[in-house]
C-alpha cells in the first residue's frame, strides 16, 4: 500500500463522519452459520481498493489459493473500491453490499467499529484459538481495533524510515546514517548546498507539507500517545508533542527558513513518480515508507542509496530502530449473512503465513503477522530489511483509533501548518486550543 495519509486526512469532514455514525446501525444483524462449514456452496463478495496490475494479480493469486483449500467457498472480487463507496454500501446493507471489505485507511477503524458496520471479530478469533497479541505486531493490532472491538485485522503493513543518498553522504564526509535528532540536524545542514535564494541540494525537507513529513509520522519517533486514560486529548500536557514542534521549527530555521524551504518545495514533482525529490536528488534524506525501495530500484536512480530507521530524540536514543506504522485493514460486514464463509476468507488472508508472505512479496509491503515477519520466504534485501526490523521493534507505534476517524490528526496538522509558518507563535496556547478542538469534535461524534 502506498501512503494515503494526507489525502485521507484532508478528505475528512464532520458531515461524513456524522452521516456514517447516524445511519450505519440500520444494517441487519448476521443470521448465523451460512452452511459453508458443512460443505454448502457459498459465494461471498470481497471489495478492495487495490488497482495496480501487480496488486490485482497478487489478490487473484491469494483468492485462488484460498478457493483451492475451500472448494465450496467462492469469492467474487471487486477491486479499486474507495472507502466512501464501501461505506455507502455497508450503510445501505442488502444483497448488493460486500461481505468482506478492506481499507487503506486505518484512521477510519474507530468509526467502523463504533458505528457497528464491521463485525467484531473477537468471538471468531476465540473460537479458532487465535491469540491476536501473539499473532500480530502490537502497533498493527492497535490500529485495527477500537475500545476492545476487533472489527478489523491487519492485512499487510507500512513502516516509515530514513532514505539517504550515499553518494551525497560521501561527498559531505558523512560515514553513517544519523541515529539521533542532533546528528540528523548536523547532517542535514552538511548536505545542504545553497544556490542563490534556493538550493542545489537540500539535506532534508522538514515542513509538514513535505509529503510524508506529517506530525503523526514525526511523533512516532517520540512515542506520543495523543490521548490520556480518560479519553481526552493530551497533546497539551504530553511534553513529547511540544518537543516535536520545537525540534521541527528549529530544523526549519537551520535549513534556511520556512519561506525559502516552501519556495524550493514548490518545485518538487509527484510523490509517487520518478520526479519524487529524493529520486531526483533535490533532497539528500527523506522520510518515507517501505514501498519507496521498489520505486528506487525500478526507476534506476543515478546515485547510491540506502535505508535506516529514522532518527529519534536525543533523550530517547535507546529507542533507535522504532518507526511509525500503518497499513491495510480488512473486516467483515456486520450485515453479511455469510459470515462463516467470510471469516474463513479473512482468517486465511490475515493469519496464513504463506498467504501473508506471498502477498507482501508481490506488492512490496511489510508482512502483518509475527510469523510472516520471521519467515525466510520474505524477499528482503538490506534496504527492505530495515522496514521489517522497524515493524518488529517493540518501540514502534501508530496513531490510535478515534470515533471520528483521523479528525484529531487533521486538527494537529492544521495547527502545525500555522506554527511552522509563524502564524501561530504561542506553542502551548496553540496546543491547548487544539486539544479542546479535538475533544469537542469527539464529543459531538458520540
Residue ranges and their predicted role:
Residues 104-159, 219:
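Hinge/lid segment of periplasmic solute-binding proteins
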Residues 172, 253-259, 297-362:
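Extracytoplasmic/periplasmic substrate-recognition and gating elements
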Residues 122-136, 195-206, 224-244, 298-300, ...:
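Short, solvent-exposed loop/beta-turn-alpha elements that line the ligand-binding surface or hinge
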Residues 2-111, 115, 127-132, 268, ...:
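Conserved N-terminal structural module of periplasmic/extracytoplasmic solute-binding proteins
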Residues 188-189, 233-266:
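Glycine-centered hinge/linker elements that transmit conformational signals in sensory
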Residues 385-436:
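C-terminal capping/gating helix-and-loop segments adjacent to ligand/active sites or protein-protein/ligand interfaces
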